[in-house]
């Protein structure tokens, strides 16, 4: 399955390590990572996936595929700037949300619109927006939760 991983473009070392662990876990279980294709969470999750031999897709805000991080296998240039945030959750079967800012929050909103299963690992509280986000505590639990949601 394809799993969209969303999170901030600028992250702490702890947040990067968490994202990398999510990428490793997804790839180890045979899942493809979809993300925004740039830095921060996006680079870390792709780096983790590539370390386990996984496949990564980056949906870029610019018109240039070369702007993808070094760990993206399939860069998709959109030329849409922040509007590309609608495409990241759309192209995953489920979404894992990590720490981030308003861009991540917008992606969470689109995940709700597209009715994607959403799992949160140290991310925004979106219950008031009516988004059914399942909070988890570890990267392994995040992948367990998206797998369970898609089997239901």
Pin down the residues of each PLM region:
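Glycine-rich beta-alpha loop segments
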Residues: 1-57
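Hydrophobic beta-strand segments of well-ordered beta-sheets in folded domains
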Residues: 1-3, 116-119
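Amphipathic, non-transmembrane alpha-helical secondary structure
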Residues: 17-20, 24, 86, 109, ...
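Hydrophobic anchor at the start of a short beta-strand
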Residues: 33, 56-57, 116-118, 133
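Active-site-adjacent beta-strand anchor residues
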Residues: 35-36, 98, 136
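Acidic/glycine-enriched connector segments
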Residues: 39-114, 122-126
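Short acidic-hydrophobic, aromatic-tinged amphipathic segments that line or gate anion-handling sites
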Residues: 75-79, 132-142
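A charged, well-structured terminal subsegment
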Residues: 90-95, 136-152
């Amino acid at each position: 399955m394809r799993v969209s991983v969303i999170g901030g473009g600028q992250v702490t070392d702890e947040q990067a390590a968490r994202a990398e662990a999510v990428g490793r876990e997804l790839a180890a279980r045979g899942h493809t990572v979809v993300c925004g294709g740039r830095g921060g969470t996006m680079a870390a999750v792709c780096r983790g996936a590539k370390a386990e031999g996984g496949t990564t897709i980056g949906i870029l805000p610019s018109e240039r595929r070369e702007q993808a991080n070094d760990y993206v296998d399939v860069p998709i240039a959109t030329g849409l700037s922040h509007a590309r945030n609608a495409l990241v959750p759309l192209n995953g079967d489920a979404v894992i949300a990590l720490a981030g800012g308003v861009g991540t929050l917008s992606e969470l909103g689109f995940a709700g619109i597209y009715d994607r299963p959403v799992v949160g690992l140290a991310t925004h509280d979106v219950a008031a927006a009516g988004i059914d986000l399942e909070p988890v505590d570890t990267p392994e639990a995040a992948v367990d939760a998206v797998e369970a949601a898609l089997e239901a």
